[in-house]
Amino acid sequence: MAIKVIVELQAKPGKRAELKSLIESIVAKEGAGQRGFLGSTRYEVLDSPDMLVEIADWESAEARAAHMQEAAATGVYAPLSEMLAAPFRVTIIRQLA
């Protein structure tokens, strides 16, 4: 069953544009080739200038879990930590049946 992954990222002060650019670069380089990845969109948070939210669509929780295992092994997301003011928050949701 398809899922959505909501990722909330708090950039260091004044670094949201750089964080957005880095995420877009990673998605462009890694996203299209990931099995089960259907795409993602990034959003700004109107009352929090350093917050960025990404909503990603996956074919299944299993496809995302496989991707995250591979990402942990390769360190593809490691550069993000340098730009974050706090650990990112992930919420995984699926449509009610």
Where are these regions (language model features)?
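Weak global preference for isoleucine
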Residues: 3-6, 23-26, 55, 92-93
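Absolute protein N-terminus
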Residues: 1-2, 97
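An amphipathic, aromatic/His-enriched active-site/gating alpha helix that lines ligand/cofactor pockets
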Residues: 25-39, 57-91
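A short beta-turn/loop motif at secondary-structure boundaries
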Residues: 43-48, 82, 96-97
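Terminal low-complexity, poorly structured segments
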Residues: 15-18, 48, 80, 92
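Short, well-ordered beta-strand segments in beta-rich or mixed alpha/beta enzyme
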Residues: 2-9, 39-68
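Short, surface-exposed ligand-recognition loops at beta-strand->loop->(often short) alpha-helix junctions
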Residues: 10-23
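Non-catalytic surface loops within mature trypsin-like serine protease
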Residues: 11-13, 60, 94-97
